[in-house]
Amino acid sequence: MTTEDKVQELTANCLRDQLGWQSVYAYNQEDYGENSLLGRQNQKEVILKRYLKQKLREFNPNLPEEAYNSAILQIEEINSSQTLLATNQEKHQLLLDGVQVSYRNAKGELIRQTLKILDFDQPSNNHFLAVRELWIQGEIYLCRTDLVGFVNGIPLLFLEAKNLNRDLKAAYDENLLKYIRTIPHLFAYNAFAILVNGIDTKIGSFCGKYEHFHPWKRLAESDPGIVDMETMLKGVCDKNNFIDLLENYVLFDNSTGKTCKIIARNHQFLGVNQAINSVKRWREGGIKDNKLGVFWHTQGSGKSYSMVFFTRKIRRKLGANYTFVICTDRADLDEQIYYTFAGSGLTNNEQELCRASSNEHLQSLLGEHKAYIFTLIQKFNQTVNPDQPYNSRNDIIIISDEAHRTQYGTLASNLRAALPGAGFIGFTGTPLVSNDEITKRYFGDYVSTYDFQRAVEDKATVPLYYDARGDKLSIAVNDLNEQIAAKIEELEIENVEIEDRLERELRRDYYILTAPQRLEALARDFVEHYSTAWETGKAMVICIDKLTCVKLHNLIDRYWSEKIQQLKKDLKKITDDQEENYRQRQIQWMEATLTAVIVSEEQGEIDKFQKHGLDITIHRSVIKNGFELADGKRISPENAFKQADHPFRIAIVCAMWLTGFDVPSLSTLYLDKPLKAHTLMQAIARANRVNEGKTNGLIVDYCGILKNL
């Protein structure tokens, strides 16, 4: 049972016998014409019009024939000037919304009507057909696909099988990529691509990198998890799951300026559906205290997209009147989550205001029945009269994103008084720590969990390794970490500029951490360490405050230049050709590398930095204007750092980019800021994203804080 044919056969049999699909073997049995096996006129057709027209008639009865024919023509039509991904996005939206046709009724009146293509409410009403070994003619080449899954005649599933001895990447490289080039019109409609070899199996988007294909190991969140073909097929191709995934768990995100097709991972599908079941219980009166639960999916596992899936499915399936208030406690996190929602097409602040700029503006937005409102919890800074709430509707859901530090106290009390009928759900990438009863008190128990270990096992994230370099260099401040971390958290919650307060209130502790000789040692070690790890990816350095960021930047800049000069001197002594080539590439990489300080703006910052002999303006210019590209255009620091091939490789930060900022090519995080447990876990997880060729992330701990995690 190891041949490719047997794997195909087992797959088709599972779809037919266990999941209720029809199954057809087309290789040498298909004929052509209206009454043929599949009703295709020729091998170039990828829409099975026989089944499509049957369902159009069934779902939209008693229309003239011209209406059905017009719908089929629109579904078949492909704009050759578009990219394949743009066409796929267009066809996906057409499936969700239906196809609009015009026809004249018996009275000669022009009627416009939207025809339903798929039944999303009763999945079993759709026609599911698996076709093995289907011949498809491209512009030049004739290709034979292993298995194509049609729903109502539309090719939504592509499955490529290999024998037991072949790696799944061969199915991706040798077949999927080839078919995208040679028979692209098949993928204009594709929802899911599955790769199988009888044991291993992965699902992804046809336009995604292989690294973004993922297993489907569980049918329920409580399952231990097993990688096998049957679990994948039952999890994805069960009729209810397939239609649910198609309708609610596929999105197109252009938040980075480049459109990406996102398919929910196994844990997102299961977790979001559990969260939605919690909302259903709340609506039915089964939850009396408005606590919808805590959604804990470890950092790097797609929590922001899970929020998008959650809100979008609720508005589509439970009612379009719901309002979601996405509440964070940091301006940069608020911006990042807004751009994820906007990039996914759910909202647009430029067209319709949805981002609260003040308490008064927040009150105004809440009175306008918006779909989405984005706010900092600090905007709830006014005491609320319980008899005069901002809005008493019971179809408002508050999503608290990583707000462990601010979900209690005055601001949270104001929030709950302002929206007494709202439901509350907490999304977090870090577990509730042992003494975190406050979180449970406000949100309830876990509604879904996906921990660090599972994420690594599922390859949703890479493992993180730890290097206690602070101890090796004797610059760790082990006994001071907790005290400093507590003070930093206190000041950041108050949303104040922390340098002066830290210096004044911590005094000796602050001076120890920011002592010139300590920063010198740290900068030297960073340059030595990162310059020898130059092939691994990008680096982020986390400092205690803005002043220290700029001080460290200046030191790194100096030692980086010295290191380049030393390597050039050493190059002259090298006699081995391979080593010489390696060193030349290292020098070129170092010379091209850009370093930037990324910190938030504050009033009077020029004078403040000048008092310390520092210049913030050169860094502020980069933050505001970004970097110039070869074509003269400019790219923002955020997008430059996210692009693996852009030479902005070293980001020095103190608070920005520590949460909700995904950079798959970030491989090493250099930590020199004492942080409390939740924030610390969020920060170190910056390095756990999956990327091509990346096997792990590395946390270099200079201050010694990770010992106590």
Range-by-range predicted roles:
Residues 370-414, 633-638, 653-655:
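Conserved RecA-like ASCE ATPase "motif II neighborhood" in helicase/translocase motors
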Residues 2-323, 332, 336-348, 368-372, ...:
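ATP-dependent helicase/translocase motor core
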Residues 298-299, 402-405, 418-435, 459:
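Conserved helicase ATPase motor motifs in RecA-like P-loop NTPase domains
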Residues 680, 686-709:
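Conserved segment of the helicase C-terminal RecA-like domain
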Residues 177-181, 406-423, 687:
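Short, conserved "post-DEAD/DEAH" coupling segment immediately C-terminal to helicase motif II
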Residues 652-653, 657-674, 680-682, 697-701:
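A short beta-strand element within the Helicase C-terminal
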Residues 503-653:
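Conserved C-terminal RecA-like helicase domain
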Residues 226-229, 437-538, 552-574:
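Interdomain helical connector at the RecA1-RecA2 junction of SF1/SF2 helicase-like NTPases
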